[in-house]
């Protein structure tokens, strides 16, 4: 895995995966799409869609644990703080040889810079929340969210997917 290349690709994902508008009905549709995709693949994950301060969709699939819900919360906090994908922030920390606690004073009990939370961006408004998955390895959590967003927004996932490592 080439961190610099992944960071460039994640930046392209974040630029492309923008909603023209977003409301609770759209959150419900996206959440159900993610639930169906995860169920079909047998993923034991938690899925969360929220605007900052308001939960819109949450599901814990068979096999997911309360720990997954806590990972969701901590990854979501990273997106809220940085307005970037939690995976991008984690890769940047890895690249710098630092932690969020070292570099930003953010406790690991509240912030997890691991893949799986993606900015919920609306054209003309910017980042208004996050779409998060937890239960797979971090790169797979990230890509699961990106794949679902591509399907929801009509983008070709093959074009935006991270290179296989």
UniProtKB/Swiss-Prot annotation:
Under the heading InterPro entries, the entry gives: PduO/GlcC-like, PduO/GlcC-like_sf, YBR137W-like
Pfam families documented for this protein: HbpS-like
Sequence similarity: Belongs to the UPF0303 family.
The record's NCBIfam families line, in alphabetical order, gives:
PRK02487.1-4, PRK02487.1-5
Q: Which PANTHER family match?
A: PTHR28255, UPF0303 PROTEIN YBR137W
> HAMAP family, alphabetically?
UPF0303
What is the protein's given name? UPF0303 protein Bcep1808_1522
Q: Which organism is it from?
A: Burkholderia vietnamiensis (strain G4 / LMG 22486)
The organism's lineage is: Bacteria, Pseudomonadati, Pseudomonadota, Betaproteobacteria, Burkholderiales
